[in-house]
Regions:
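Glycine-rich phosphate-binding loops of nucleotide-dependent enzymes
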Residues: 2-264
Length: 264
């Protein structure tokens, strides 16, 4: 009897041989990877390996020197960041980028802007349907803050007054506000204590099923990476040196050398 293998999960994003050159420096050199739907894929590597440059290309902040980036069947290689966001890609940054003088709720409402119908004129005139949309957006923001574990009291506080771990939660809620198909997280546990990191790890593992999205993760904490990732891509000096399931990557001699140095 012939056993048919289950069909492969479709890729929400496909990266094909992307290169980014700044002057004479190759920051990313011919990297390819697939991000399946409802999966968690991690990109790891030493500082300066090209991870954030890769993220910036995937979100439209940088244009690749060569190669292709496909979101589903659509080529977004040269698309503007707002177009990429509108197609369902959201991200957080290594350095938190919240508006400190706005409340946590207001910060998350900004993340919903791409899904709102009111334009400039509507926001000025504010007819009844615009006011209704604003109320719905605020309710949605509060729901997301509760979902990421922020208390109702903290939702009303200025973002700049919140503890670091709570600011991270607000940033993730803001990214989720755009209803992404793909969420890019850049060092989400940076600066967190072990308890906060463990809580965020558990939260990330729930996201693909609960929100129907895929996650592409940059993270230096190997406990987090090995605990949540289905596949890992390893970069060193802009080149992909390894790829595969966590156990395979962890035992790869090239990965060990990149992180620990060549052993005599």
């Amino acid at each position: 009897m012939t056993v048919t293998a289950p069909p492969a999960t479709p890729a929400i994003m496909r990266v094909e041989n992307v290169v980014k050159v700044f002057g004479g420096l190759t920051a990313v050199g011919g990297v390819s990877l697939d991000i399946p739907e409802r999966s968690i894929v991690s990109v790891i590597g030493p500082n300066g390996a090209g991870k954030t440059t890769l993220f910036n290309m995937l979100t439209g902040l940088y244009k690749p020197t060569s190669g292709r980036i496909l979101l589903g069947d659509r080529d977004v290689t040269r698309s503007r960041p707002d177009v990429v966001t509108g197609l369902g890609v959201a991200r957080t940054f290594q350095n938190i980028r919240l508006f400190g003088a706005m409340t946590a709720t207001e910060n998350v409402m900004i993340g919903r802007h791409a899904r709102m119908r009111a334009g400039l004129i509507g926001s000025i005139v504010r007819p009844p349907w615009v006011r209704r949309e604003e109320r719905e957006t605020e309710a949605r923001a509060r729901e997301l803050l509760d979902y990421v574990g922020l208390s109702a009291a903290s939702a009303n506080r200025y973002a700049g007054e919140l503890p670091y771990g709570d600011q991270r939660r607000v940033e993730i809620a803001r990214a989720l506000a755009s209803d992404p198909k793909l969420l890019l997280l850049d060092e989400p546990t940076a600066g967190m204590n072990p308890q906060e990191s463990d809580a965020l790890t558990d939260f990330m593992q729930r996201l693909p099923e609960e929100r129907g999205l895929a996650i592409l993760l940059i993270e230096h904490d190997m406990k987090v990476v090995m605990g949540v990732s289905e596949r890992i891509t390893v970069l060193d000096h802009g080149e992909k040196i390894a790829e595969g399931e966590p156990a395979v990557v962890r035992a790869d001699p090239k990965v060990i050398e990149a992180y620990l140095g060549k052993q005599d």
